[in-house]
Amino acid sequence: MPLTEEQIARYSRQIIIPKMGGRAQERLLGSRIVLIASRQDLEEPLAYLVGAGVGDIDLCVPESDDASLRSLCEKMRDLNPDSTVSYGSLAQVPDLVFALLGSAEVVRFAAAEAPSVGPAVVARLDAPGKIALLPAPPPCIRCAAGGLLDSFGERREHAGFIAMLATTEALKILGAYDNAGAAALFRFDGLRTIAEPIADSKRRCACSPA
């Protein structure tokens, strides 16, 4: 659906980004995403997605505090009426699964509740922080995602920064920005404040295709 004048004004800061434009914004408004995270890691990335104009966002949260999540959904509706934020129902197939893994509890919950469809953006919020871009579900996520499901270590102060980097990658995929969507794995170096790509080791496991 073409953007209205009000929407052009609302999203003008991102529409003018080279290779973004109105078409990418229309894709964002028509997209559906599942956001998996603990309550403490949820609000800032969610506000970023809503502010950018992602059309439908389903929250997948381990904690069952309905009042808190209901209040958060109302807050996001006030932030941007173009976005619909809901929780408790994952009936429709999303365009993207976005997971912020801050603890083993979130991993277990995601494995049980989240739809196993691609593409996906998965971020580890402990140390060392990692972000994986998965265009399709790997045959064996433990091997293919480079340790994303290894034992969790100490939570670091850069967890929020990792979440913001991952949110940017999610928006690039949803908006089909440039070459977004290619499989990749990054490790965050907090001392140098950079995200370094991790080379594909080409390893195979028993469940991988030949």
Question: Which residues are covered by each model-predicted region?
Answer:
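Adenine nucleotide-associated cytosolic modules
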Residues: 1-210
